[in-house]
Amino acid sequence: MDRARPGRRRASSEIVTEGKRKKSSPADLQKITKLLTVKSEDVLAQSPLSKLRGSECWWTRSLRNKVICLDHKKPKAARGCPPKGLPKRHLRVMLTNVLWTDLGREFRKTLPRKDANLCAPSKVQSDSLPSTSVDSIETCQRLDPLHQSLNLSERTPRVILTDIRQTELGRKYLKIPPVTEASLSDTANLKSEQLSSSSDGSLESCQSVNHHKSFLSESGPKPSRTGDVPAKEAACGGQKQGDDGGVTPEMAAPHPKDFNTGNKGCDYLEEGTSNKNTSYSYSEMDHTPVSRKRKKRGRSNFHDSHNSKTSLDKPTEHTKEEENDSSVSRKLEESGEDSHQDPAPPEGLAPESLESEATNLRSFAAGQEPDASAASGRASSPNKSLESSASSEVSENSSVAVKGEALTLKEASPPGGSSEESQLLISAEPIVVSSDEEGPVEHKNSVILKLQPPHEIMSENQGTSDPQLSELTLGACESVQVTSELFPYNPDVENISCIKSNSEMDLKLDFIFTCVYIGKIKGTPKGCVTFTKKYIKIPFQVSTNEISLTVDTARLKRFGLWESKDEDHSKRSHAILFLWLSSDYLQDIQTQLENPMLSQQSKANEFIFLELNSSISQREELKLKDIMMEISTKNGNLHLSCPLPWVQALPLFQDLSPQEISFLHYYYASASALPTAAGADMKKKSVSQPSNSDTIKPTYTFLHKQSSGCYSLSITSSPEEEWQEVRNTGPVQKLIVYPPPPTKGGLGVTNEDLECLEEGEFLNDVIIDFYLKYLLLEKASDELVERSHIFSSFFYKCLTRKENNLTEDNPDLSVAQRRHRRVRTWTRHINIFNKDYIFVPVNESSHWYLAVICFPWLEEAVYEDCPQTVSQQFQGQQSQHDHKMTDNDPHTTSTVSTSAEDSQSTEVNMSVPKKMCKRPCILILDSLKAASIQNTVQNLREYLEVEWEVKRKTHREFSKTNMVDLCPKVPKQDNSSDCGVYLLQYVESFFQDPIVNFELPIHLEKWFPRHVIKTKREDIRELILKLHLQQQKGGSC
């Protein structure tokens, strides 16, 4: 063949070398390298064929040359119509593996896609990469059988692949993952399947190899992806064959011995085209299934919608010239849409594994004879796509193919109807395959080929409700054979679509019982009582009659489960199941029992008592409640949601005589160890819970012990007795009057007031007033008593009480004067301006706090020399203040040194008297700081101002300057109920450790420990009870 003809310009992408006539010279190699360097931005090497050597390569050593045309600038040549004026010739090209060059190594490190698509020698699978180019790149090659006698050189053919994603326009679609999985096949015909693409152009690569492995290079494509594409789209390729080599469109049936089962591998050959009209709609890109995201390995057959719509390998007749590119693109798009409705089974698909590096594939020779009838049946029936197709699904992070091992699936469908039997050879790793062409919804229904023992295949439904996925035909078992040594049978992956859920099963519970009581009837068991949501079945026997009573749960009113803890009856059962039936259901009960002893007029027939063999377990009790809850929900009877207690059930039948109800006659009477006739006494006993009886059970028990002929007796609390809180429900009783008579103004404390001393309760005003009086009279020193006055807890409430204006005598009075008139009688016997400390308990919004008016007779702060006793107290407060300041001051070094100097000077000058500050102020001691302090202080200032006018007959202004308000830091409460307790403790601590120096600031954080508050309630309770006993003794004397 001529290298080039005159008048024809050689394409830049064509690399032509002669076979045995002329070896590639260094100059040619330099040209090749230069061409590759120019296209460095668009080159993507993905072929691992460089490692396919020797007899394992599908390239026959007898063939010395191979031709490939990579023309990116001739769209018509790429479409199958050669340029006019050019002579017809056969080109031969030596494929170069870019992975061995520096440029290839660079791309191998940077590009994310590292796998290559390998094909069997008899078929080239071309999947369209997600392209961002407007051009549609299609490559179609056929190898001429005329060159089958030529021998290829020793060098292994290599393929240069171009990835359009590396262009400037394609980079913005890099986020779309590529979906290119190839299939291995040893069929004799060429088939090209195309994935749905999201780009404006479709990438197709086609190769056709005959059974003699002869090759013919041509530019015309032959799209055979769908059966809807007319034959005219492949006409140009057929005409080119006829012109160049005279090859007829009919291809001879392959001979089994000519097949090389070990040859695998083919890379994509991509060609660019400038046709911008050939495009898919963008909406199709949104539904493109991304197979690379499927990491799961499984085994399954193919759904009809999962199979690509690829035409069968039938003889194609050459008709006419190919239409324009836009027409071809439209037909391809229509065929892609129809592929989800009427799929045809793809032939000769084989699973393969893709690796970032080239992977060695070792083939296992299989000399099986073809099965013509099986293959022809698969080719003729579109309903057997599950048996004749397999899809490849490869995870980019998993390595499937192992070096030296391979998986081969051979299928053939020759025109004459002859075929060969498909054979599957497995590798050391499970091979995951999926369809090469999937619809927009199939990514949710990933079907996977399952590897298991020979002649067995199983499917698993994943993400779909179609029952056809769980069905396997006999043809699938015949077409796929898997060795069992590497992949044993796994029953865990079987189809579980027919498993019935546990929720559909009814709840059922059985009890072993000893007796059943229905009205006057007592029966012995003949089995277990069964509880379900629909019925309750009770098998029993009365005399010689065996009865199986079935109670409809819709007629059940209440149920009860009672257990007795009485040790006296330990020989008997301690569990009773109680069923209360509807009165209109008694006729059906009588019909089932066939006993004239039952009377519909008797209320006792509504009750069924089941004496259980033993106490039921907690699990059985919970299940019984679940069944009753289901019955309650089903029938709308809310009473069945909880069991009926014995106390509520006893009044239902306690008025019945033992002759009417056998339960009272047999079980209840014997359990009480009383005569049968004593019906009135029997009703006072209970099986499980104490009834409303006058008999009081002792709360103690005797323990007897014999030792050395002597008996010892001890009394302890009954272990069965439960401690309950005792609440006095009787009349209110006055416990104490404090101070007791003959002192006037005594305050009475009742038993109701004592209850507020329980933990978590709020203290009422009676307890507050009682303890304040007690502190003033019993705890305070005589000096403090003379200098102090305590108002009642009602004082501030009366002072701030709102009254109707009509009740006021003089409407011209100010607000402060009106308030003072309400409490003017509270100080008629005392002058508060002669006191140093006036305590005012305040309650606002159920919160107690204390207000202390200090030195109301002073108009400004006064400093006095304190006596020796007060000086020691003052020094303690000062040291406490210094310690607090040391903790709060960040400059601790200077503060500590200053305190040390002060202490030294104090020790030296002990004889020097200290000054004590008396400041008129209002102290607010609040354990929660939740009150409106400013309003309280202002109300007290206004009261003092009016009281001063009344007592001193002069006017004096109590303002913020001469009567300041102070809020010292005091111990705080840690709950929401101890505010009253803290108020009492503030007053008690004030009397025990009074504030002698009012120099600011005043720190009282460590005024008293916290544990004092924890026991304060109990201390007050004991005090009241102690006073109660004292006053009772005094009254009795």
Curated annotation (Swiss-Prot):
- Keywords noted in UniProt: Cytoplasm, Hydrolase, Immunity, Innate immunity, Phosphoprotein, Protease, Thiol protease, Ubl conjugation pathway
UniProt cross-references to InterPro entries, sorted A to Z: Papain-like_cys_pep_sf (IPR038765), Peptidase_C48_C (IPR003653), Sentrin-specific_protease (IPR051947)
Region of interest (Disordered), residue spans: 1-27, 185-399, 873-909
What ranges does the record list as Basic and acidic residues composition bias?
A: 301-321, 328-341, 880-890
Composition skew (Low complexity), residue ranges: 192-208, 379-399
Which spans does this entry mark as compositional bias, Polar residues? 272-282, 891-909
- Specify whether Translocase is a keyword of the entry: no
Provide the Gene Ontology terms for cellular component: cytoplasm; nucleus; postsynaptic cytosol; presynaptic cytosol
Its name, as the record gives it, is Sentrin-specific protease 7
